[in-house]
A protein has these predicted regions:
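Outer-membrane beta-barrel pore domains
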Residues: 32, 36-189
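Aromatic- and glycine-enriched pocket-lining scaffold segments that form the walls
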Residues: 1-45
Length: 189
């Protein structure tokens, strides 16, 4: 990979020097049986060059990598599918302590009728602490709990519509009221 896993897809085009400090990615998974699959992922690489503006003189993006490690589980039986993932990430920042973050989710999907499904997801992002200039420790962002529920319909194998409601709860401080309703029509090929 030529950029960190937390970067936007629009930052992925190749440029001269992109592989000077590459991002390494490892993924292992094992199908326990027809119903269970377990996996793990590991990634380590530098910030994207667009983040280099605040890096001290004599350093470059390769001196401040992001490390990501996670596990995932998938289970399916009959009309029910369950997915779960948990990830830890650490971003080595040039001007503050290392930034750590834990995130996880559990999702269940139920096939109500052929083509018709419903789903629910619970997720959290738990931010680590950094020391301010006076040495006092603070969380570097507010923890987030997210609940999603929705459903959809597959008209064909590759043509579908779905709707989702996402409720976001930020812990501590002002609640930004950033809940979402999303309706999507998709066509895969």
């Amino acid at each position: 990979m030529n950029t960190a896993p937390a970067s936007w897809v629009f930052q992925w085009p190749l440029h001269a020097g992109d592989f000077r400090d590459p991002n390494y990615y490892l993924r292992l998974s094992y199908a326990v049986d027809a119903s269970w699959t377990v996996g793990t992922s590991l990634s380590r690489g530098p910030y994207d060059r667009q983040d280099a503006a605040g890096i001290p003189a004599g350093k470059d993006t390769g001196d401040f990598p992001q490390t990501l490690a996670g596990v995932d589980v998938q289970y399916a039986i009959g009309a029910v599918e369950v997915f779960a993932e948990a990830y830890w990430t650490q971003i080595q920042a040039p001007l503050v302590d290392n930034l750590e973050l834990w995130s996880w989710y559990v999702e269940a999907k139920y096939k109500i009728l052929p083509g018709l499904f419903g789903a629910v997801r619970l997720a959290q992002m738990i931010f680590g602490s950094i020391d301010d200039a006076s040495g006092v420790s603070h969380q570097w962002d507010r923890n987030l709990t997210r609940v999603e529920f929705g459903g959809g319909y597959f008209f064909t194998r590759n043509f579908f519509t779905k709707a989702t409601v996402q409720l976001n709860y930020t812990m501590g401080g002002r609640e930004p009221h950033d809940n979402l309703f999303v309706w999507q029509v998709g066509l895969g090929f």
